[in-house]
Amino acid sequence: MQTITRTSRNSLASLTLGAIGVVYGDIGTSPLYAFREALGQAARDGIVQAEIVGVLSLALWALIIVVTLKYVIFLSRMDNNGEGGVLSLMALAQRATGGGWVAVTLLGATGAALFYGDAIITPALSVLSAAEGLKTIPGLDGMSQTAIIGVTVGILAALFMFQSRGTASVATLFGPVCLVWFVALAGLGLWHIADAPEVLTAFNPLHAVTFLVSHGVTGLFVLGAVFLTVTGAEALIADMGHFGRRPIQLGWLSFVWPALTLNYLGQGALALKALAAAEAIGQPLANADWFFIMAPDVLRAPLVILATLATIIASQAVITGAYSLTHQAISLGLLPRLTIRQTSEHQMGQIYMPGVNWLLLGGVLLLVLGFKSSSAMAAAYGIAVTGTMVVTTCMAFLIAWKYWNWEPVWTALLIAPFLALDLFFFGANILRVSEGGWVPLLVAGLVGLVIFTWLKGRRTALARASEQGVSLNETVMALHARPPTRIEGTAVFLTQDLDVTPSALLHNLKHNKALHRNNIVLKVEIQARPYVAPEQRVVVDRIDESFLKARLRYGYMDTIDVPSDLARADGLLVGPGGTSFFVGRSAIRFAARPVLPRWMTVVYMFLHRNAADPTAYFSIPSNRVVELGSQIEL
């Protein structure tokens, strides 16, 4: 019993350390810029003590309400068979509502689109903020911003180019490095709190309320900047499938939250001390890079190096999250198939998506070169994250109501304060659209357009194919009446509709005048759950002695391997002659009477034409595939 308990504790400690290295990388690097930017918004007419304490109070209570209460305590319980994140919640809400609510799909698509807007900003802002710390090192204070940008571009380019090799070999370092990072955050904070203990009054929420009331519109701009302290909170639920609820909660409550709180208090204490010194000589206090100047000169260079490593790890977590979200979106039918490569033979889920990788790199570098400083870029950050949080909260209401069967009134009373706060933050960030907030909105809009076009185009194409198709039962009856030449072996015809004869089967009969001894009409179905148990994978319905219909069911996080799963199903792939897979490849053409707007058809044609090969996506060896073409007019 003691051995089991000890093993369980070791496993919990290991998972908690892993969560600290992956889940909290984004929110853990916020002290680099969050307090500085929030105070900068408040200090347009000079900094006073009430503004320092007020901004700090807003930051502390944002961590308490948004991260601790909403995400760690409430939303972490809302998982889809252990998986979290906006698309997992969408899939769970679809199951809860029977899949018939279009609003659920729209919410999920909106959340996913906003995530990509956030994904290009996080690496750019965090790495650039760390690189700007170089100017605080004695002797490097004259370093130009152009040189800082060059260093940032070099680090980011190297990071994205490294992705194709996978991160399994270095991932074990993420936890220890971030552990040191959070210890440094806490240590620096404690050191400065002792110089101005009155900073602890910021725990009184009246300071936050008074600040907002007294500063009017300026208070809303400050609130938008304060939100930078909680960016990255979505990762707490998005990574539940990797680490589990308890390690994530334990890591936050016992380590990360205290470290962040102490560091923000330390930055506030340093600002109060600097304010007292400035007032003593009759000078106004200018805003500063409070995080880096917390460290003494001799430790400034090591702190910059540590901050750079922490931001690289945070960026890696966002990149990996983008791969994972894209994989889920493809499985759930929101995006066309993209090339996916496994980067580890031993660890599931270690994937690399070259298309996503290079698009992210292009966006990240454009941001760095366009905004040129972390302060300018910070205005663009919050709007995508707040939008995602609004979507998540709305999804939480649907799940609590429809899936947990809570009373709608009580559910609304619980969710309403969280939604009100999310909308308040969202409104505060909307004010900064002209300062750069338009960038993530533009990215989200483009991704949303792709998702909407793919959903609409694919649904329309499937409907047209069904209209033009022939009933499978009628085809089987016709083959009984006029039997073609039989050849040994098994033919597997992939289809989207089991009631319609696959076009590949019709073309095979037309051109080859032959039919295999055994024929399987197969549909691959993606369930609204992350995983499907192997024993529930295959569902078979026999039509006659030579034809059967089969469903292969996968979760949206499962790795699809059609040949292996068919081979494991008793009695499917039998007899001599081997197995051939017939895939219909449809070409989209303009119809004489179009059913979609022309621009949408053009975009859908582009997406359809550039989608990854379905045989690779289904793990079917190319030497066992026969492709037969058809045309669909839209």
UniProtKB/Swiss-Prot annotation:
The keyword Protease does not apply. One of its GO terms (molecular function) is symporter activity. It comes from the Bacteria. InterPro entries: K+_transporter, K_trans_C, K_trans_N, Kup. Pfam families: K_trans, K_trans_C. It is a multi-pass membrane protein. GO terms for cellular component: plasma membrane. The chain crosses the membrane at residues 15-35, 55-75, 101-121, 142-162, 173-193, 208-228, 252-272, 303-323, 351-371, 381-401, 408-428, 435-455. Keywords: Cell inner membrane, Cell membrane, Ion transport, Membrane, Potassium, Potassium transport, Symport, Transmembrane, Transmembrane helix, Transport. It is found in: Cell inner membrane. Belongs to the HAK/KUP transporter (TC 2.A.72) family. Transport of potassium into the cell. Likely operates as a K(+):H(+) symporter. This is Probable potassium transport system protein Kup 2.
